[in-house]
């Protein structure tokens, strides 16, 4: 399945720096320092992208990371400011679980998950990170999880239902559990 290209110029994107890391390269004359950044961009309406930048100065690294994130945009299906279904994704040694939450719950997420889901416009979410909590891998695992989300219409058509029937079934199950 080919991913659709999203034009970043048509969106009002907001940048968030997740991590700034000073890295060094050992050369004959000593160490050469540079900066590595992880940047998340999103419009708060279902579009999000992640990028990494590396440069001798922090502002250049942030700019490069933001440009990479704008080239890497995806659309996230939202249902009432949360995700449509639970998803568990693994990236490297990091495993991320994202679950839909009731309105008013807020984003219950750690350092790497929060900026990605907030940039996407998700207001209510439950999440858990298993395994490695390296911020780069957590951000990439979260991004992978969001890219694997299917919309409510796709889920309903797969089950030969209407989206309304699917939502009614979900709310009925949630009220029975409470």
From Swiss-Prot:
Pfam families, alphabetized: Ribosomal_S5 (PF00333), Ribosomal_S5_C (PF03719)
Residue ranges of the region described as Disordered: 156-178
Single GO cellular component term: cytosolic small ribosomal subunit
Quaternary data: Part of the 30S ribosomal subunit. Contacts proteins S4 and S8.
Domain of life: Bacteria
Entry note about domains: The N-terminal domain interacts with the head of the 30S subunit; the C-terminal domain interacts with the body and contacts protein S4. The interaction surface between S4 and S5 is involved in control of translational fidelity.
Annotated function: With S4 and S12 plays an important role in translational accuracy. Located at the back of the 30S subunit body where it stabilizes the conformation of the head with respect to the body.
Alphabetically ordered keywords of this record: Ribonucleoprotein, Ribosomal protein, RNA-binding, rRNA-binding
Domain spans labelled S5 DRBM: 13-76
Protein name, UniProt field: Small ribosomal subunit protein uS5
HAMAP family in UniProt: Ribosomal_uS5_B
GO molecular function, one term: rRNA binding
InterPro entries, A to Z: Ribosomal_Su5_D2-typ_SF (IPR020568), Ribosomal_uS5 (IPR000851), Ribosomal_uS5_bac-type (IPR005712), Ribosomal_uS5_C (IPR005324), Ribosomal_uS5_N (IPR013810), Ribosomal_uS5_N_CS (IPR018192), Ribsml_uS5_D2-typ_fold_subgr (IPR014721)
Family indicated by similarity: Belongs to the universal ribosomal protein uS5 family.
UniProt xrefs under PANTHER family: MITOCHONDRIAL RIBOSOMAL PROTEIN S5 (PTHR48277:SF1)
GO biological process: translation
């Amino acid at each position: 399945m080919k991913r659709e290209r999203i034009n970043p110029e048509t969106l009002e994107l907001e940048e968030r720096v997740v991590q700034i890391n000073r890295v060094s390269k050992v050369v004959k004359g000593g160490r050469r320092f540079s900066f590595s950044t992880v940047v998340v961009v999103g419009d708060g309406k279902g579009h999000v992208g992640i990028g990494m930048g590396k440069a001798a100065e922090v502002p250049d690294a942030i700019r490069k990371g933001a440009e990479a994130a704008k080239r890497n945009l995806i659309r996230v299906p939202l249902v009432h400011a949360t995700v449509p279904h639970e998803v568990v994704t693994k990236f490297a040694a990091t495993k991320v679980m994202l679950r839909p939450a009731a309105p008013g719950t807020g984003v219950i997420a750690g350092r790497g998950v929060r900026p990605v889901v907030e940039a996407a416009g998700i207001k209510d979410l439950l999440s858990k990170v298993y395994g490695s909590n390296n911020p780069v891998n957590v951000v990439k695992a979260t991004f992978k999880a969001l890219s694997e989300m299917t919309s409510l219409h796709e889920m309903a058509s797969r089950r030969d239902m209407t989206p309304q029937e699917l939502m009614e079934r979900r709310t009925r199950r949630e009220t029975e559990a409470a």
